[in-house]
Amino acid sequence: MSGNSANYDVGYPIYGAKFINEGTLLVAGGGGQFNSSFPNKITALKVNFQKKKHIRRFREITLDSIDDAPTSLDCNNNLILVGCNELFNDSSMENVNHHLRKFVFEQEHLKFVASIDFNRTTDPSVFTKFVYINQRATVAAIASSEVPTVIRIIDPRNLTENYEIETGREVNDLHFAPNGILLSYITSNSLEVASVRDGNFVARKTDFDKNLVLSNIRFLNDNTLLVAASLSNSDGVSLLKLGVSSKGVKILKTASFMFDLNGITSMDVSPNKKFVALSSNDNLVAIVSVEKLKLVQLVPRVHESTITKVTFSPDSRYLASTSMGNTINVLKLSGTSSSILRNIWKFFLNFVLLVVLAGAIQLGYKHNVHGFIYKHAHDIYKSKFKENTTIDQGSSSYFTINDDYRGITESADIISATDVASDIETEFSSFDTSTMRTTTEDEQKFVWISSSADSQFTSADIPTSASSSSSSSSSSFYEESVTNEPIVSSPTSEITKPLASPTEPNIVEKPSLPLNSESIDLLSSSSNSITEYPEPTPDLEEKLSSLIVEQSESEITTDRESVSKLLSTESPSLSHMPSSSSSSLSLSSSLTTSPTTALSTSTATAVTTTQTNPTNDAANTSFLDNSKPASTREIYKTKIITEVITKIEYRNIPASDSNAEAEQYVTTSSSMLLTPTDTMVSSPVSEIDPIASELERMVETPTHSISIASEFDSVASNLIPNEEILSTSASQDSISSHPSTFSDSSITSGFQSIEVSTVTSSVLASESIPSISDSTFSKFHSISEPVSSAIVETATSSFSKTETKTSRVIAFSTEDSERSSALIDNSEYTSVLADNLEPTSVLADNSEPTSVLADSSEPTSVFTDAVQSPKTSVGQSSLSESTNIEGTSMASMIFSSSGASIGALSDIGKGTLSVESASSTVAQPMPGVTTTAPSFVSSPHKISASSIDASGFVQKEIMIEVQSSKDSSEAFGVRHKISENVNTPVSRMLTTEMQASGTVDVTEDVSLSSEVISALNVEITSLPNPVAPPQTIAAPLNNNSNTNIVNDDNAVAGTVNYAGLHDEL
């Protein structure tokens, strides 16, 4: 313990000292009768180390000159007792000695109260040796210098004696317990503990070491005593910690200080019971720790003469010592330290140890001891862990994962998705996000692409769709890709990243399927040509139906060569139609476009989300922003994968200028039977790399394929806009107004038969016919579709073994109560249409069945001419002031061949059956066409066309599941391998999945362009009849109600945050 100290000379020898309070020290002394040169005084001093003068005289009382000097002093609670003999020359006072005097400290003044004689002797050699007051100042004990010592217990308040304790020996010191109940005193070799109430002895100890001379005693607490003793045969001091109990006194701890102290003249314990102060005969002050009985600080030569008293302040901050040399020393306690000698000794020991350690290290380095120690420890580690660790021989080492990295890239598949965010002007503002969620399951070694649930129906169950058209203007959504370099995934160790040209006005957003590179090559290319918007078909349900497509390894090489040739043959002349070079995605599947298989299956080789816009119209391109490049994302997958591609769009489109009100078209499929089945596309992956699978897990967020359907059901109702906007009519002269948009080119692309629940816009729309609502669905998955959505799911595939042919597509239409048949001028498709369309019948005028027949001998072109001629009346649109809406089912099917789309059968409600034509000569947008999808309600409604002026949302999700290879030939129909027998009809059992939901969609200025459809392609559009809830807040997939989509009239798109999904603007 270290601190500052201050000295003060009071001018007389000091025999007693005690702190009255934290800053006031009371001392007493004098020369006595034998040295009259020193006055006898009682002085109060102020101690404050914050002031310049740390100790100053505060109060003082001077005693009579004939009195003896004060020899003892104690105080508590401002009550002061001083032992001082008085001497009188008066003979009448010869037998009286008032040796005990009482003072009080009131209002910072010393006041004399009384004096009394308890010794009853006038011998001047007898003086008051000890005066002690308990902490509450209720009991005091005094003892004289007479031997044997008599201890008198008195009441300091009235100075009365209670009883006496005859010790029979000389008492060296005494002290009260903190509770004031016990009193302990010591002689040279014994200790006594007595009760203050009656004076009976409680405990006694007399068997101390004979070399110890007990000199001082203090209570640490009510049951613990600290005794200081000097050594009789040598220099030094011992401290003994004693415990007092009913069984006696027991030594708890002992410490000796041989070289530091020589005899003890005074002792005191700090009020906090942490330190004990000792003064020795050689004028040293030692501070010892009470807990460990170790020397904390030794202050040498504090006084020049013998130290008479040491005392602590009540707050334990100051330690004061007095001496016979008239001086007072006050030490401010601020820390812990030891004596100088002890510090020097510790430094010497540390230095020696440091030298020895340095020498040992140098010697060990010289003899390579550290090397032997390391080798020995390494051998122990290897022997211990290698014996207990068994490494699977079939798996790669945990510490050599980078060695197999090239193997990972060879076995992985590259999936590229391009997301573009562009600023668009005011009313043409749009908001589009794409999100993909994937789950993997490590069950099998083979990978298939399939949908979660499929449906099956025969070719006789041909669905129909309703169509309507009207004249309006619409905004175009334009995005751009970044290069025209294709993305080819081949079984090589290098990773080909897609590059894009920033100047190319083409946007293709492609979340494609992960397939093994040994079986299927993914081809994504973009050319200088402009891929144009198909007809806006707002998909309310998304359907993934496919059939197993297998191929041998020998056919893969040929397919790759054909893909390379196809990429190299980009021509600017094809810039106005969606050709194979501008397709979104191609899968070389080595399929033959035989006419016998054109309509027998619903087969798709890829799923691609394509959003493009015609840029020929300067009005549509004036507001486009081409300055922001696209970002490309590559994902490596080799395991069983389930993907959910979510698209959310926001459109703010003004109301239609048409005065006609909305009309509801209701259709039905009379004999469609849908049953669940497993649908798979592509060939299995021969091997799955385990490390690549681990890499895939880190890239994608896991989910479960079974839970996707339930998530769709739970949020579909919240994703439908509350405005129920019905269909409007379109001008029939729209096609003829753009005759330059028709060109001849083969369309060799695949469409993944995505379920579209909507009303297809067509210029061939005519008066609706009654329909029968008997179509059933096995399961409905509610997926909302945005207003004015123009998202078309397309996929392209290139075939090397079959030469694609271009054929004209004829549109079929039937007027009221009339039966019309359609013929195709291409003879090789005749048998297929006749085989598949013959059993199909549609009721016209509620009674007469209308059949669509195909005949190879008599091609009919009347409807083709009607499409190109603005004067030809295809049908009359049934428009009225208001139209009753009935919740019925509607479906449409679009047929296609390798060269072009064969057509689409549509049941357009009342009185008209039309087959929509996707002729190879049609590629230009039709101005003034408005497509509307009715909301699904169970009761009739009347909604005016003026209510169309509202914004809506579309959320579109495509779920793609990659499963293990299983034998599915027995499930839900017979499937044949196309690679083995492409001329044989694959199956008449169309495997598909129907997912249904409701939406409201209004689109203006929709372009009509040829849909990119492959040789084996059937597009089914169904319209179920669930009730749409009247709310616009779209709940996220995780049912988090706090995440909303805000739909306002200012065309501000709100961001949707899905838990576990990655949203991109």
Curated annotation (Swiss-Prot):
Q: Give me the ranges of the annotated region Disordered.
A: 458-477, 482-520, 551-625
WD repeats (start-end): 259-298, 302-341
Instruction: Please give the residues the UniProt entry marks as glycosylated.
Output: N388, N620, N1039
The name of this protein is: Putative guanine nucleotide-exchange factor SED4
* Residue ranges of the motif Prevents secretion from ER: 1062-1065
Q: Which domain of life is it from?
A: Eukaryota
sequence-type repeats, residues:
824-833, 834-843, 844-853, 854-863
Q: Which species is the source of this protein?
A: Saccharomyces cerevisiae (strain ATCC 204508 / S288c)
Its topology with respect to the membrane? Single-pass type II membrane protein
Role, per record: Putative guanine nucleotide-exchange factor (GEF) involved in the formation or budding of transport vesicles from the ER. Positive regulator of SAR1 probably through inhibition of the GTPase activation by SEC23.
- What's a BP term from Gene Ontology annotated to this protein? regulation of COPII vesicle coating
State where composition is biased (Polar residues): 482-495
Q: Does the keyword Ligase apply?
A: no
Annotated compartments? Endoplasmic reticulum membrane; Golgi apparatus membrane
Which residue intervals are annotated with compositional bias (Low complexity) in the record?
465-476, 568-621
GO CC, sorted alphabetically, is: cytoplasm; endoplasmic reticulum membrane; Golgi membrane
Q: Where is this region: 4 X 10 AA tandem repeats?
A: 824-863
Ranges in the topological domain labelled Cytoplasmic: 1-346
Q: What Gene Ontology terms describe what this protein does at the molecular function level?
A: GTPase activator activity; guanyl-nucleotide exchange factor activity
Q: Which Pfam families match?
A: WD40
Q: Which residues carry this modification: Phosphoserine?
A: S65
Q: Does the keyword Phosphoprotein apply?
A: yes
Identify the keywords attached in UniProt to this record, alphabetized.
Endoplasmic reticulum, ER-Golgi transport, Glycoprotein, Golgi apparatus, GTPase activation, Membrane, Phosphoprotein, Protein transport, Repeat, Signal-anchor, Transmembrane, Transmembrane helix, Transport, WD repeat
Which residue stretches are annotated as topological domain Lumenal?
Answer: 366-1065
Q: Which family does it belong to?
A: Belongs to the WD repeat SEC12 family.
Membrane-spanning residues: 347-365
